[in-house]
């Protein structure tokens, strides 16, 4: 699951130039994966087939002698198993997403988890097999025809092997993880699914009860200042009531992770997430240094937005609040079909292949978008490896957030689609570059909306919508990183109390927003799902990387015109085949450890802020 940050956009029907109005289903097709839901006989057969493949793989690895041919055969089998596990995973997760909170899916997640654990043991043995070859022998093996396409991934596996403990200990750690790190992450889901709050609607004075997920959506999109503030106050109070439970969860999840990292030779809590994102500390430092150096540009923007919203103080809930009353312009909701047509059309301005892909995804029902009760909040894209397809989950309400979410997730899916002819291990791109393609797709759609504005008021609303992404990437995400870095530092010395977690988060928000918020959200550590994800530590800085990296690519796209598409696809196809620094150097000829590239992205934000301030002068 990947829960992605939404940007805001407004689609204008006047921009719809197509003569034929397509009608698309808003429910996805999961039956083409396994028909019949979670009771599908084909799903049951797949469980059995994958289990048998894992058993056979384990037998083969146990008796293997290191050679290029043996490594190639085992790699093929491992990738087949990985594809099967990935396909089962998206299927179960897909059904659980549209029937959120149903405990019937729990046994399936447990069964899937057991398969992953069973696969991990022989995979660790396979990694150690690679170490039995000396450097010269390994290099010769990688040069063979069958291994050449996956040589980068195999090299990473061989490096991983150097950290591994004995097989028995590694097997125990993986088994403990089911009731350790994974269990604590699932426990957080159970806690959050059971939370609700009551708020007062300022327009009619009525008290309304909503879930935690509904509250989060309303905090981003509620136009009434007082109602939004009421929800925020109740939201903070709700998470405060659960702080002992969520603090226990966060502490134990982090404790397991730190112990595991230490056992495997990691010297700091940042070493593993940087390794997972195939980037260096120097690149991370250069990126954050540019973010810090450019925060001041947001201050006049927030001051002007505070005026436009008519607020005495700017609170956490106001950072991406929509502008709904500017001049005589009134944003209108957009139908799903209109949003689809606009996305397809605008993708086509940069890449006909992107447009054709998006059209296919809508037509083949790869997207779950229907607004109905019982769905989990947020959005994600997951690949279906066995079918060489993708599935996209979101809830489309016609609001200013939702069409951009579709574009974002289609960007992810297009990225994955460019790799279907390559081995599965060439599809294992890291989160930081994964967020590049999705954010690039959003930029296309949002800039098209701004260009098509019919008045200054409309353009101002669209620019403000576009600003939600840089606010998230420069400020909100940085607050998460600063908190998590401080928390993991303190957690090494023992459990961190809820009160101290609040203090760390408040300090992180103060620093990240440079004092621009009058009212903060100290229980953000408790309310934000990303802190509780077991599979990915530091689920934050890759977003900022992806945003700024995509800004650089977008600038190149505008320069290259018709020559851009092939260059872009070539970059995407290399995302799992080299480090982030190597990717940037090869395809953009830039050095990510230096500030220049990152500053170019910040300069684009400054341009939007300058235009926002100039346009808004007449409305205050």
Placement of each model-derived feature along the sequence:
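A well-structured
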Residues: 12-329, 614-620
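Post-HExxH zinc-binding segment in Zn-dependent metallohydrolases
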Residues: 430-458, 466-468, 472, 546
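Short pre-active-site segment immediately N-terminal to the catalytic Zn-binding motif
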Residues: 331-334, 387-406
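Long, K/E/R/D-enriched contiguous segments that form extended
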Residues: 313-342, 415, 467, 471-473, ...
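Catalytic zinc-binding patch centered on the HExxH motif and its immediate surroundings
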Residues: 329-334, 367-388
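C-terminal, non-catalytic "cap/extension" segments appended to globular domains
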Residues: 4, 126, 130-133, 152-165, ...
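Inter-helical turn/loop segments and adjacent helix faces that build the functional surface
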Residues: 281, 350-353, 417-425, 447-462, ...
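Active-site recognition of the HExxH zinc-binding catalytic motif
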Residues: 265, 397-417, 438, 443, ...
């Amino acid at each position: 699951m990947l829960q992605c940050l939404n940007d805001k956009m407004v689609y204008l029907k006047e921009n719809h130039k197509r003569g034929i109005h397509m009608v698309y289903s808003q429910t996805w097709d999961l039956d083409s994966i396994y028909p019949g839901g979670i009771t599908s006989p084909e799903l049951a057969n797949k469980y059995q087939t994958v289990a048998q493949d894992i058993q056979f793989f384990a037998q083969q690895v146990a008796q293997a002698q290191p050679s290029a041919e043996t490594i190639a055969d085992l790699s093929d089998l491992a990738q087949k198993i990985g594809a099967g596990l990935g396909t089962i995973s998206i299927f179960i997760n897909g059904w659980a997403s549209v029937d959120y909170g149903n405990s019937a899916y729990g046994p399936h997640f447990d069964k899937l988890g057991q398969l992953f654990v069973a696969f991990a043991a022989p995979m660790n043995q396979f990694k150690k097999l690679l170490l039995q070859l000396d450097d010269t022998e390994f290099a010769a093996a990688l040069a063979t025809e069958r291994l050449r396409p996956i040589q980068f991934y195999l090299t990473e596996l061989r490096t991983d092997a150097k950290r591994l403990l004995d097989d028995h200990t590694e097997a125990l750690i993986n088994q403990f993880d089911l009731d350790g790190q994974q269990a604590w992450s699932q426990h957080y889901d159970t806690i959050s699914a059971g939370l609700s709050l009551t708020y007062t609607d300022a327009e009619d004075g009525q008290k309304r009860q909503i879930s935690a997920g509904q509250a989060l959506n309303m905090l981003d999109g509620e136009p009434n200042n007082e109602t939004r503030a009421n929800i925020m106050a109740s939201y903070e109070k709700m998470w405060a009531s659960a702080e002992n439970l969520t603090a226990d969860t966060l502490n134990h999840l982090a404790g397991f992770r730190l112990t595991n990292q230490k056992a495997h030779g990691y010297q700091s809590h940042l070493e593993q997430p940087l390794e997972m994102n195939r980037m260096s500390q120097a690149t991370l430092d250069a990126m954050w240094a540019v973010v810090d150096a450019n925060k001041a540009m947001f201050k006049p923007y927030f001051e002007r937005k505070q005026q436009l919203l008519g607020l005495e103080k700017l609170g956490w809930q106001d950072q991406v609040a929509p502008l709904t009353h500017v001049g005589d312009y009134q944003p209108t909701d957009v139908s799903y079909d209109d949003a689809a047509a606009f996305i397809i059309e605008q993708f086509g301005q940069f890449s006909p292949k992107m447009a054709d892909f998006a059209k296919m995804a809508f037509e083949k029902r790869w997207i779950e978008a229907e607004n109905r009760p019982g769905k989990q909040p947020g959005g994600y894209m997951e690949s279906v490896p066995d079918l060489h397809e993708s599935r996209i989950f979101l809830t489309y309400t016609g609001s200013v957030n939702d069409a951009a979410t579709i574009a974002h997730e289609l960007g992810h899916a297009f990225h994955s689609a460019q790799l279907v002819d390559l081995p599965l291990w060439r599809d294992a791109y890291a989160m930081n570059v994964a967020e590049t393609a999705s954010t690039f797709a959003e930029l296309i759609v949002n800039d098209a909306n701004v260009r098509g504005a019919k008045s200054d008021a409309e353009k101002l609303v669209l620019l403000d919508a576009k600003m939600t992404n840089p606010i998230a990437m420069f400020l909100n995400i940085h607050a998460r990183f600063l908190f998590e870095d401080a928390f993991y530092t303190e957690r090494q010395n023992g459990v961190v109390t809820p009160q101290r977690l609040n203090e760390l988060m408040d300090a992180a928000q103060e620093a990240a927003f440079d004092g621009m918020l009058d009212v903060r959200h100290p229980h953000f550590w408790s309310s934000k799902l990303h802190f509780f994800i077991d599979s990915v530590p530091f689920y934050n800085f890759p977003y900022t990387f992806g945003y700024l990296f995509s800004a650089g690519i977008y600038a190149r796209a505008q320069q290259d015109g018709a020559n851009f598409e092939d260059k872009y696809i070539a970059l995407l196809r290399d995302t799992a085949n080299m480090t982030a620094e190597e990717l940037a150097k090869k395809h953009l000829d830039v050095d990510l450890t230096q500030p220049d590239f990152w500053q170019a992205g910040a300069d684009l934000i400054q341009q939007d802020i300058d235009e926002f301030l100039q346009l808004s002068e007449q409305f205050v």
